[in-house]
Amino acid sequence: VALNAAQPGFATTVAALRLRSWKLGAGQPMDVIDKFTDADFSHIVDDRADVHVSSRDGRFYLGYFPNGRPGGADEDWVTGEGWVIAVTGTADVPGYRMAFGTDTPAEIVAAVVARILATSQPL
């Protein structure tokens, strides 16, 4: 960033900011859901049209909540949480959980899912 210490305040140029365009908008949830084969995963669509995907061994879970995830301390909607991914750990290594907002681009979530699936191996 171009900075002139002799002048009070902050000054820069558009070129110095290196403005970028970023992927925004929820996108198409099927970009994520299509990553899961019927042979290896169970798919459930509930009465709220939320989608739940789990691995046959039960160690992987993905939830898609287009209107936000239900639940919370007062059973209110957890507003803004649109995607939940969880992998159960083992006796020796803890698992992990991550969540993405309802406006997170599905393309970004799909990339995360693809990477997780690439790391799993049959026993």
Regions found by a protein language model. Name each.
Residues 114-122:
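Cytoplasmic membrane-interface segments at the C-terminal ends of transmembrane helices
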Residues 2-59, 123:
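Negatively charged, low-complexity tracts enriched in Asp/Glu with abundant Ser/Thr
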